[in-house]
């Protein structure tokens, strides 16, 4: 493993590649404790795993305990020493679904603390560029799901299942809570086994221990699906028929606005 682009301030111990694997609980606080350990030991681990990604290895595994007090100090140092832009980018990129995101973030943080707050603007640097690639993937997916989430009705609650590459529920929360403040709804992320639940004007992000199965659609949803079929056939222009385009998810939130006029 290479620490390409990582430098140490004058007089500081040089960062070295360590034949060790960090194992943490997968939380952002846990990752911040990994950052603390990496800086304390002046080492870049071979890998950073969560229990879900743990596998057989010949390298020693170092369990990194989650300490909220340590996590708060580390996070505070981002804004204080590196600036709000770096704090935002690191926090957002942690939601990425990229498997080696922790190592990419660690490399960047070592570089940023060595060079200062302007590091985040060096988008072409080989250590910085991967963070913008992760952000681009997140931004694209958030924009996609804000416009195309397929809701179905289940006993008075709107339900939707999504399969995003990245963990975007926290980023979707402001959009859907603002769009449907009076509705009870649930968005289930089947990839990350998490739920965004908005019920009784209260919103929660829940992590599930087991996969969730939604019940069959209600009669109203079946009627709504039939209404969409009629809507599609009415607007379809045969000369421009595109079967692949038909397979694209339909924005049910947009269609609901037209339900009474069809």
What does each of the following model-derived ranges do?
Residues 59-142:
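Charged, alpha-helical interface segments at or near domain boundaries
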Residues 30-41, 106-114, 174-178, 226-233:
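Short, hydrophobic/amphipathic alpha-helical patches that form generic packing surfaces
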Residues 181-183, 187-250:
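A recognition module on extended beta-rich or small alphabeta surfaces enriched in W/G with H and D/E
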Residues 3, 7-68:
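N-terminal ordered "arm"
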Residues 118-208:
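Internal, well-folded beta-alpha domain core
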Residues 17-21, 158, 213:
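Glycine- and acidic
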Residues 253-260:
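Conserved small/polar residues in nucleotide/adenosyl-binding loops
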């Amino acid at each position: 493993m290479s620490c390409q682009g990582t430098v140490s301030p004058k007089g500081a111990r040089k960062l070295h590649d360590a034949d060790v694997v960090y194992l943490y609980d997968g939380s952002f606080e846990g990752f911040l404790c990994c950052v603390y350990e990496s800086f304390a030991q002046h080492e870049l681990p071979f890998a950073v795993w969560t229990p879900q990604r743990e596998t057989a290895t010949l390298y020693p595994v170092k369990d990194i305990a989650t300490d909220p007090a340590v996590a708060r100090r580390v996070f505070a140092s981002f804004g204080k020493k590196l600036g709000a832009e770096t704090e935002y980018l690191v926090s957002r990129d942690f939601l990425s679904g990229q498997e080696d995101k922790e190592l990419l973030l660690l490399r960047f943080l070592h570089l940023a603390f060595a060079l200062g707050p302007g590091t985040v603007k060096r988008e072409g640097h080989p250590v910085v560029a991967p963070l913008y690639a992760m952000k681009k993937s997140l931004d694209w997916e958030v924009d996609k799901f804000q416009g195309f989430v397929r809701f179905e009705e289940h006993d008075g609650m709107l339900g939707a299942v999504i399969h995003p590459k990245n963990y975007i529920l926290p980023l979707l929360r402001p959009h859907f809570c603002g769009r449907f403040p009076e509705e009870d709804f649930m968005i289930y992320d089947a990839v990350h086994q998490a739920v965004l639940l908005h019920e009784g004007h209260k919103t929660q992000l829940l992590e599930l221990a087991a996969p969730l199965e939604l019940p069959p659609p209600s009669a109203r949803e079946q009627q709504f699906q039939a209404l969409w079929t009629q809507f599609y056939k009415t607007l379809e222009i045969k000369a421009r028929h595109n079967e692949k385009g038909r397979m694209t998810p339909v924005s049910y939130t947009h269609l609901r606005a037209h339900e009474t006029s069809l």
